[in-house]
Every structure is written in structure tokens, then in C-alpha cells.
Amino acid sequence: MVAWNGTLVRPKLLIGASCQCVYNIYLHPLRHYPGPKLAAATGLYHWYWTLAGRIHRQLHKLHRQHGEVVRIGPDRLSFIAPEAWKDIYGPGTTSHKENKKDGRFYAPTPNGRRAMISLLDNQHHASVRRVFQPAFSDRSLRALEPVINKHVKRLMHTNLRQLARADEPFDLVHLLNCAIFDIMGDLMLSESFGMLEQSAYVEWIETLLVALRYESVGQFLLEYATLGKLLSFLMPPSARRKREQHVQYTAQRVDKRQQKSEATKRDIWGFLAAHENAEMLDIEDKHANASLFMVAGTETTITALSGLVFLLLQHPPCMRRLVAEIRDSFTCEDAINMDTLQGLSYLNACLSEALRLYPPVPLGNPRVTPADGNVICGHAVPGHTRVYVSTWAACRSASNFGDADSFMPERWLPDSGYDSDRKEASKPFSYGPRNCIGKSMAYHNIRIIIARILWNYDLLAAAESDGWMKQECFPLWDKKPLMVRVMLR
């Protein structure tokens, strides 16, 4: 009886799946949108490229073939037009409806709570963001600048000086991980990891870096819960444990910070505690958000810095111009600070161009259209459609940028010959009321570190890092070692 049922069920499943594929291709409300037939038939097309780490390149290829909107799944549309940022991620208005976050993409943390980025209700998110917002304001950042400078000075005058004396190639990504995680640990919880002192990762950070490589697998298993049970081998038990350990380590640090006096500690948690509505977040909510900040507050900065250095090393004239701007603008290193760096036009142009070519988040985060549909870039998109801007593809599109694959910082300067570029297509920190809350902090950390490095040292490329930017994403970049050398100026 069991065998007979099994032989009967399998054809039914096959017939049902085949009928669904035919419907998706020929009858589905999205059938008129261009894209591969296989992508229209099944969501597994999208997940094949995602799990392979090459979805960003495949999306770029498809947009070159089909234009500014592509159907990348049965219920999934990818956009690259600049207007899509506002239409997809912007707030609701009287003339345009709001798209909500996709619950099939954003999972709760292992403690069952949702961090700010994964809150599905936009009003709830707005309430939580208001509590955290003062901690990430320019005023707070200026108050925290001495904390940042303490670690940056150690990086400049201890770690890099030793490496300059050794005159051997070293992995800049590893060194930046040590520096940025030390800074973020101090900024968030008044306790550095001490990794610059050791020039090595502590267990928590090793755990986190391993867990990040399996983020795409986790999202796949979330979306295909039943199928995921059959494919659980995609995420080894050790990777699951690493993710859980990251949350546990974060919780332990938060609990330790909670026991300290707010009056004696100046950090993000101190600003949070001072907010009149801080009590809306219980300890489990704080654990979840601290886990988020330890990733979002570090990964974007490390990615942007390493990408900027690589691109400058690949383009010596740009490096020479930036070095000249920095060294001509300051008479001493201590004059390099948050306020003075904002006025360096070529530095900011180089940073904008690096973020265009190597955005820290190469894929747009999905939203879902309301039940009665929405209008995106002039297209009437049916309800319950998953929509997003493919960041990397948008920034590499010839329809948005001239010399789209070339590092051209001058495109961000006046009268550069790139006035026809659709620069608003590049939104490395997203757009709208749910954009990156730590954008200002990231920009400052990037500026202060690259400016002080180039004020003190000459950077040299190592042959081992040729082709470094050809990376996979899961969905964040899987960064390889970036081997460089430094010399005292």
C-alpha cells in the first residue's frame, strides 16, 4: 500500500508542478514582462544564481538583454531605472502607495525577535527607528569622534607602521576587519575587541564572518521551508551554530553593557537609553538590534574601504590626485577630522565612484506591492509582486552611466563631461524612510581612515590581488584577501 501511494503521489506532484509552470509562463499577471522563460516558470531559477553567488552578474546580463525591468521569478521583478528607487522604497503618498518589506526574505533573529531592518510593519519600524536615530545623528557622531580617532591612530601609528617596516605584502581586508570591528565594538558597547592589538580575529568575529557566507542559504531555506528540509545539507550544522553563537555573543555583550552606568559611558547604547521611548525595546529587542548593528555597522564600511583602495591602486593617476588633495589640504594629521574631510571634493568623488562600482549591498532588498497593485516606473505592477532595484546592475548599466564599467571619479564633479549620467541610480545606502540609519557614520569612518592612511603612507599594489573585485555575493560580497604594501611617505 505504501509503495502504491508513493507511485501515485509522484506523478501527481509532477503534473501539478508542470501545470504551475505553464500557468506562470502563459497566464500569470506578470506574463507580459520580459525575461527568461525558465525564470517565469519557477523561482528556482533565481535561487540557482543566488546560491551560486553570481545573481548580481546574471541580473546585469538580463537587464542588458531585456531593458530596465526584468521578470526574474514567477512573482519577482527587477528594476534598474533611477525612478525605481522612489517608486519601490519611497514612503506612501496620496498619489503613490507604499510597498512593504518581503516577509519571505527577512527572518527573525534566533531569539525570535526582529531587528529594525527585518520589521515588516512600516509604522512599527518608524517607531523603533526614532528611538535609535539620535545615536546616529551628526551631533552624536561628533561626540563619538574621539572614540573613533583612538582606534584610527593605533591603526596608523602601530599596525601600519610595523607593516611598513616589514616591507612585505599584507591582507588589507583582514586589517580593516580588525580596525572597524574594534571601532564598532567601542561605539556600540564601550568595549573594543582588541583585535588591532593582536592583529588577529577574536572568536566572535571569526564566527560572524563564517555565518555571513551562508546568509543566502538561510534565505533560501526560509522561502522554501518544505523543500529546505530536503536540502538542509546546503547549510552545514556548523554554520547554523555559528549564526546562533553570533547572537549569543552579542547578547552577552549587551547584558554586560546594561550593567554599566550610563553617565560614565558614551556610546550608541548610552544615547539609546537617554531616549524618552527607550522602554519600548526590551532586552530581547536590544539583543536582536545589536546583532544587526555588528554586521551593518562594519560590513558596509569594510567593503567600501577595501573597494576604494583596490580601485585607486588600479588607477595610479586617480591615486596621485587624491594623495595630492589630502596632503595639500592639511598641515598636520590631527587637522583631519569629520568636518574638514567633508570639503574634499575629489575624496568624495572617489568614494562615490567606488560605491557605484562596488556597492556594499549589491542586490536590492525586496518589497511587496500592495494587494491592489502599484505603479513603478510607469508600469502597472500587480499586487503581491516582489520588486526591487538591482543595485549592482543599475550602477553598471550603460543606460545610467557613461563608461559604466570604468573608474571615473570626475563624473561626480562639475563640468566633467558626464552631465548626462543618471547619477541618482546609485543609492549605496538605499533610499526612503528605511534607508541605512548608519550612513553618516559609515561615510565618516571611510573618509577618516583612507585620508589618514594616504596622509601618512604610500600604498602599493601586490600582484596577488589582480582581479580582486571579481567576487561572489551571498548576498554580501565574499571578499578575498586584498594584498598590498605600505611605505612611509
From Swiss-Prot:
Topology in membrane: Single-pass membrane protein
Enzyme Commission number, as recorded: 1.-.-.-
GO cellular component: membrane
Residues involved in heme binding: C436
Entry's transmembrane regions: 292-312
Keywords: Heme, Iron, Membrane, Metal-binding, Monooxygenase, Oxidoreductase, Transmembrane, Transmembrane helix, Virulence
Induction: Expression is up-regulated more than 10 fold in toxin producing cultures.
GO biological process, one term: biosynthetic process
Pathway info: Mycotoxin biosynthesis
Catalytic EC class: oxidoreductase
Keyword Oxidoreductase set for record: yes
Cofactor(s) in the UniProt record: heme
Major location category of this protein: membrane
Protein localization: Membrane
GO terms assigned for molecular function: heme binding; iron ion binding; monooxygenase activity; oxidoreductase activity, acting on paired donors, with incorporation or reduction of molecular oxygen
Pfam families in the record: p450
SUPFAM superfamilies associated with the record: Cytochrome P450
Changes seen on gene knockout: Produces smaller amounts of AM-toxin than the wild type but still causes lesions on apple leaves.
Functional description taken from the UniProt entry: Cytochrome P450 monooxygenase; part of the gene clusters that mediate the biosynthesis of AM-toxins, host-selective toxins (HSTs) causing Alternaria blotch on apple, a worldwide distributed disease. AM-toxins are cyclic depsipeptides containing the 3 residues 2-hydroxy-isovaleric acid (2-HIV), dehydroalanine, L-alanine which are common for all 3 AM-toxins I to III. The fourth precursor is L-alpha-amino-methoxyphenyl-valeric acid (L-Amv) for AM-toxin I, L-alpha-amino-phenyl-valeric acid (L-Apv) for AM-toxin II, and L-alpha-amino-hydroxyphenyl-valeric acid (L-Ahv) for AM-toxin III.
Family: Belongs to the cytochrome P450 family.
Further comment: Gene clusters encoding host-selective toxins (HSTs) are localized on conditionally dispensable chromosomes (CDCs), also called supernumerary chromosomes, where they are present in multiple copies. The CDCs are not essential for saprophytic growth but controls host-selective pathogenicity.
PANTHER family per UniProt: CYTOCHROME P450, CYTOCHROME P450 MONOOXYGENASE ASQL-RELATED
Annotated protein name in UniProt: Cytochrome P450 monooxygenase AMT3
Taxonomic source organism: Alternaria alternata (Alternaria rot fungus)
Gene transcribed to yield this protein: AMT3
